[in-house]
Amino acid sequence: MFRTAISGLVCTTFLVLLGFPAVPQEPADKGAATESGQQTFNNACRTCHTTKEGDNRLGPNLHNIIGRKAGSLQSYGYSSAMKGADFVWDKEKLDRFIAKPDEIVPGNNMKPYGGLASAEDRAKVIAFLESPTTN
């Protein structure tokens, strides 16, 4: 009888532990989505931008872009149009800007970039920019 009780307790404990992993698990597709977003970022943005803090290229670094006031990095020489832009980057504004930068900030210095037409690709880039690996 003692053996049966111990055996039942061990099985119950094992089943409980299976249901409650010690480390929070990320959905399997989240890593794939970030990787896909990084690939899209690399194809559409990386020529001029990086996500490394302080590493400006032709364009400013996009580290922690969401929540940042437009044209506000002290270490980058923005166009007067971007310096004068009176908004804070959020996902919606970033989506519209990536699609048609001249409509959001006329006079920006992003020529010859004309925008990223695919809403799916823009969403991938934005998800990548807000991911913990880039912030």
Model-derived segments and their meaning:
Residues 1-4:
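Positively charged n-region of N-terminal signal peptides that target proteins for export
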Residues 8-18:
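Bacterial N-terminal signal peptides
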Residues 20-42, 58:
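Electrostatic cytochrome c docking/interface patches
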Residues 21, 43, 68, 100, ...:
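Residues within well-ordered alpha-helical secondary structure of globular protein domains
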Residues 34, 38, 50-91, 112-113:
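Gly/Gly-Pro-rich "capping" loops immediately C-terminal to redox-active cysteine motifs
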Residues 42-51, 125:
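The canonical Cys-X-X-Cys-His
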Residues 90-135:
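C-terminal capping alpha-helices of c-type cytochrome domains
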